[in-house]
Amino acid sequence: MTAKEMAMQTITMDAAKAHIGFLASDELRGRKAGTNDSKVAAQYIKSQLRQWGIAPLADKYEQPFSAYSMEWQKKKPYYVEPDSVAKLKGMTHRKLNMYNILGMIPGKKTDEYVIVGAHFDHVGYDPDLDGDQIYNGADDNASGVSAVLQIAKAFVESKTVPERNIIFAFWDGEELGLLGSKYFVQTCQFIDQVKGYLNFDMIGRNNKPENPAYMVYFYTAAHTAFGDWLKEDIQRYGLNLDPSYRAWDNPVGGSDNGSFAKKGIPIIWYHTDGHPDYHQPGDEACKINYEKTRDITRAAFLNVWNLANVESY
């Protein structure tokens, strides 16, 4: 068994249950961006990276940023773009302080990067609801965070130095308009040296109960190798996945992949489609398909291995 294959085996259902169980617990009250509950989630992520010896991207794991909205109304958009923020600061009614969490495993080529990411915020809680008031966000997106964490640990376990730097990114403010990933892309001094971005958003459920292995695999159409990789790995490693392959000419929508696609960076996005509990209190950890979450995470680990080590794609 190769180092890659042994590392893949460290990705387990038990680890997914532990990560999702904590992040989607009632104690975190839905991890709304800009709240102490979201900060607890960020501290948990940071503690995992530190425990595994994964260094921060910069001098610390947190990348702080602020977002501004013109009014207090819930539906008003938030802005992190420098030009927009400069115009809004004088008349803003609301400011949110948030931060991304960023870790990195250095590669041999210090001037090339790949990024694997997921947002850790959700939509909080509603004290006016009858019954369950907490939007736990197990699928959206504790499931995706668990995948990035397990992939980070698997690379450590591989004891292999990748060809390219691998950044493990946990975005804040996605539910308010991809704010964390937008800020990262706009301020990243090496953005033109990022060779690929892999995104997770909702990988633990699906809307096809008759086919629990169903998932959606979005990727930049010009990079046909991305589709080939998944097909080959499902067959080679017996992963119980039934992907709908979505080659996308301009993959700018849906999730944090859009922030990178707008810069022309090739993307892969794992997703298991919508369901009735989307942005509802019913998005609970007990409803996650942990076998599928594990197999998606293993498939994505193999993707990231290729992104970090294959010469061209």
Residue ranges and their predicted role:
Residues 2-10, 26-36, 88-92, 129-141, ...:
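Second-shell loop/turn segments in exported
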Residues 3-40, 51-62, 66, 276-283:
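N-terminal capping segment at the start of a domain
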Residues 19-24, 63, 100-104, 113-117, ...:
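Structural recognition of the beta-strand scaffold that forms the well-ordered cores
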Residues 23, 49, 91-127:
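Acidic/His- and Gly-rich active-site-bordering loop/insert found
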Residues 31-104:
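A non-catalytic alpha/beta surface segment that caps or lines the substrate-entry region
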Residues 101-103, 116-122, 126-177, 300:
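Alpha-helical metal-binding/catalytic segments enriched in His/Glu/Asp
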Residues 171-272:
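Metal-dependent peptidase/peptidase-like ectodomains
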Residues 274-313:
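His/Asp/Glu-rich mid-to-C-terminal helical/loop segments that flank catalytic regions of hydrolases
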